[in-house]
Design a protein with these regions (language model features):
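Short, low-complexity, Pro/Ser/Thr/Gly-rich segments in the mature regions of secreted, periplasmic
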Residues: 108-127
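Mature extracellular/secreted ectodomains of secretory-pathway proteins
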Residues: 1-104, 111, 115-116
Length: 127
């Protein structure tokens, strides 16, 4: 995704950005596209993906090229009107990935708590 903000890059910046975001999400989900009941995910990776989305939104809104133009026109209809639908859509993605990471971390915490409780309340074995 750094390629999007490289002055020397002459290719399709939108394709580069979307491919980078897609790849990041797949990596955050453990390189999987299908999940089953007992599959698990690392909540920290999902959380990190959410922070990366925030960084991308910030860079798209603020980073300029050598001619003081944005690398990608993302949230402007014309020079006097801002189009905030871009930020709203990315805000939804950030909110969903944050909530998903929180839910996953709660699941992990509950599993650890159950193991500790069953261990501490277990029957002593004779020796």
């Amino acid at each position: 995704m750094n390629q999007v903000f490289d002055d020397n890059f002459k290719g399709d910046r939108v394709l580069s950005l979307i491919t980078g975001l897609y790849t990041m999400l797949i990596k955050a989900h453990g390189d999987k596209k299908e999940f089953y009941m007992f599959d698990s995910l690392d909540p920290q990776k999902i959380y990190n993906a959410s922070r990366n989305f925030e960084i991308i939104v910030w860079k798209l809104a603020s980073k300029k090229n050598e001619e003081n133009q944005p690398y990608l026109l993302s949230n402007e209809i014309n020079s006097s009107q801002a189009n905030l639908s871009f930020e709203r859509e990315f805000g939804k993605i950030i909110g969903r990935t944050d909530y998903f990471a929180f839910t996953l971390s709660e699941k992990t915490e509950r599993a650890v708590t159950r193991v500790i409780q069953s261990f501490t309340t277990g029957i002593f074995l004779p020796f």
